[in-house]
Design a protein with these regions (language model features):
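Flexible, acidic/Gly-rich N-terminal and inter-domain linker regions that tether
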Residues: 1-54
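C-terminal scaffold of the Radical SAM
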Residues: 45-46, 76-98, 106-401, 458-459
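Canonical Radical SAM [4Fe-4S] cluster-binding loop centered on the CxxxCxxC motif
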Residues: 52-87, 180
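Basic amphipathic alpha-helical segments that dock to polyanions
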Residues: 392, 408-417
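A short, conserved structural fragment
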Residues: 415-425
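Minor-groove-contacting beta-hairpin "wing" of winged helix-turn-helix DNA-binding domains
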Residues: 426-430
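Short, amphipathic alpha-helical interaction segments positioned at domain boundaries
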Residues: 434-459
Length: 459
């Protein structure tokens, strides 16, 4: 499979609109409060009859400083004692949820996200992993995908060693930009020494994969400053890059109101940055996975994509399509069977529900048959840039051309523009269409029209 990209400025201008990132379909906006504790328990019971491995996501919400660009669910505090009651309740939730799942179901994927997971000290991290191991079947052979997000500003070599000993084998670190003016504008002061020390320690302690997060479109960024940041990181050759377009949505995220809109780079500069990093990463030997993600050709994501086994969920791209995803901690989102479930967002609600022995469910949604069909279509397109109609027809007992008659008509314009090739049996996304894969997927999203302004721009 060709894993390259092509930068076509005219096409990008024409199709640059707001749209979902499709870590799920339906998107999280379709979750509703009518989904209950009992509904979640019922889906777990049904899931156990099918069996299969699990993926666990733990949300550690604490950060000791606020990054103005951040759209994550977080709690800002420099008082480390605030983590103590949260960790106690998280362990109770792990016990409640873990005991509902068949203990023979192996955890093939595990992720600590946030917030800042390294807000916890070593004793707390050890406790969290021990409780998890007690109530879920964790792997002991180091063959699972156990990943953790770290903040280089507060992560030292000893912390990296401790995380590796706890069983983590993949690490992701936020960087965003090295330029001092940009860092000051977003309130994230992070030195090169701190960043590269974490990358070096991760390799020295045997982490199998390192990922670096960068954001373009931040205030005061230029092509030159971002290129300088990227060149320095490339010297350390991380296994993966996640390079996101900053979505400025101050009406939804209060911390973004600290950013001066006049300092944000115009669309033309963003596009120049996009073209620059695409060229640099390709020249450095990385392949384009999709949706702002690049990886080395021998990385598991790149291999899975070439073999047609790549998947996408709330954690991003994954090689574990067969796992039920269990969300733990406030705001976490999971997928069990054909349902999406989100936990409550406020600590007091979380505490109250856990103390009553209830699962801390806030919202959820049961997928109907149409949702399942469209989810599979979007997943295939966003992961493999190709969709074979016969596979969908066989899986769901439909006639693709009849079921998606309107959508196929709407794809005609994209075919004329050179984004894709549409035949009687398939959709093949062209190299020029890969950066615009969200637009192609949006054609199949029946919920989109009234929700479009709540999403970021596709470029």
């Amino acid at each position: 499979m060709d894993q390259s990209i092509k930068f076509d400025l005219d096409l990008i201008h024409r199709y640059n609109q707001s749209g979902p990132r499709y870590t799920s379909y339906p998107t999280a906006l379709e979750l509703h409060e009518g989904f209950s504790d009992a509904d979640y328990r019922s889906h777990i019971t049904q899931s156990n009859t099918l069996g299969g491995p699990l993926s666990l996501y733990f949300h550690i919400p604490f950060c000791d400083t606020v990054c103005f660009y951040c759209a994550c669910n977080k709690i800002i505090t420099n008082n480390r004692a605030h983590a103590v009651p949260y960790l106690e309740n998280l362990c109770k939730e792990i016990a409640m949820v873990g005991d509902l799942f068949d203990h023979s179901r192996v955890v093939n994927q595990l992720h600590w996200g946030g917030g800042t997971p390294t807000f916890l000290n070593h004793q707390q991290m050890t406790q969290l992993m021990a409780v998890t191991r007690k109530h879920f079947q964790l792997r002991d052979d180091d063959q699972g995908e156990y990943s953790v997000e770290v903040d280089p500003r507060e992560t030292h070599s000893e912390t990296i060693r401790e995380l590796r000993e706890l069983g983590f084998n993949r690490i992701s670190l936020g960087l965003q930009d090295f330029d001092p003016a940009v860092q000051k504008a977003v309130n994230r002061i992070q030195s090169k020494q701190q960043t590269f020390a974490v990358l070096e320690a991760a390799r020295n302690h045997g982490f199998r994969s390192t990922n670096v997060d960068l954001i373009y479109g931040l205030p005061l960024q230029t092509v030159a400053t971002f290129a300088n940041t990227l060149d320095q990181v490339l010297e350390y050759a991380p296994d993966r890059f996640s390079i996101f377009n900053y979505a400025h949505l101050p009406s939804r995220f209060k911390t973004q109101r600290q950013i001066h809109e006049a300092d944000l780079p115009p669309a033309e500069v963003r596009l120049d940055i996009l073209q620059m990093f695409g060229n640099k990463l390709t020249e450095a030997g990385y392949v384009y996975i999709g949706m702002d993600h690049f990886a080395k050709p021998n990385d598991e994501l790149a291999i899975a994509q070439r073999e047609g086994k790549l998947y996408r969920n709330f954690q991003g791209y994954s090689t574990h399509s067969d796992c039920d995803l269990v969300g733990l901690g406030i705001t976490s989102i999971g997928r069990v069977g054909d349902a999406y479930i989100q936990n409550v967002k406020e600590l007091d609600q979380y505490d109250a529900l856990i103390s009553r022995g209830q699962l801390p469910v806030y919202k959820g949604v049961d997928l109907n048959e149409d949702d399942k069909i469209r989810r599979e279509v979007i997943t295939q397109l966003i992961c493999h840039f190709r969709l074979d109609f016969p596979s969908i027809e066989q899986q769901f007992s439909i006639q693709f051309a009849d079921y998606f008659a309107n959508e196929l008509v709407n794809l005609g314009g994209m075919q004329n523009d050179g984004l894709l090739d549409l035949s009687d049996n398939s959709i093949q996304v062209h190299v020029a269409g890969r950066l615009l894969i969200r637009n192609i997927c949006m054609v199949f999203d029946k919920y989109l029209t009234q929700k479009q302004q709540q999403f970021s721009k596709v470029i």
